Amino acid sequence: MSPLGSAGVLAPHLTRSTSAEEQFEMKLKQGHRVFGVDMRIVNDDEEPQPHDGKTRGHLVVRGPWIISSYYNNHDANDKAFTKEGWFYTGDIATLDENNILQLVDRSKDVIKSGGEWISSIDLENEAVGIPGVVEAAVIGVAHEKWGERPVLILVPQDSDNPPSEDSVRDFLGTRIAKWWMPDLIVFKDEIPHGATGKILKAELREEFRDCLLYTSPSPRD
């Protein structure tokens, strides 16, 4: 069982009615809820989203062992709970028709661009496949029209001969939606990590805090 209260063991009816390949795909996900934990995904307006395995939303949970409030801290409660008392886990997720959970990003890392969500994790997973790249990180940076746009930060295998920006865009162009394409591609010698090896995106966001992207052609021209 995961800390979220989900289990990866498939129910008997699913093992009987699905192929081995489908079962493998299900087991790659975080699993279905366990007894005593309710899960749903909601949009920014706290509206429940469909369990279709595709629609992404904020994962919220409730149950007898789930925190119901912070003691004497109204500001924290307003941020951590929906109006109906569901607790925000801080994850972006999907739920399918069998109520199997899949985590796709952290709420603080997802990029909200023109009313649509871009998963930083999905974009990073594609970017690390670029020939000559050893590590990738994606953050959202302010944009004068779209609110946020993705910035792709790459660590090249050879810092003296990094991939060209055109080759990066050509590689990603066949693998991601057009509107997911990063507005800015930056090469760095290294990306900051914490003690556990996790990328410190807060440091990257601080580094690009004063960056403001514009729609091309730039209004500054």
Feature-to-residue mapping (PLM):
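Conserved AMP-binding/adenylate-forming
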Residues: 2-100, 107-110, 123-124, 130
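Flexible lysine-rich "adenylation lid" loop at the C-terminal edge of ANL adenylation domains
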Residues: 46, 188-208
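AMP-binding/adenylate-forming catalytic core of the ANL superfamily
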Residues: 63, 68-69, 78, 92-180, ...
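Hydrophobic/anchoring residues in structured secondary elements
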Residues: 138, 186-187
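Generic C-terminal helix-cap and adjacent flexible tail
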Residues: 209-213
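Conserved small/polar residues in nucleotide/adenosyl-binding loops
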Residues: 214-221
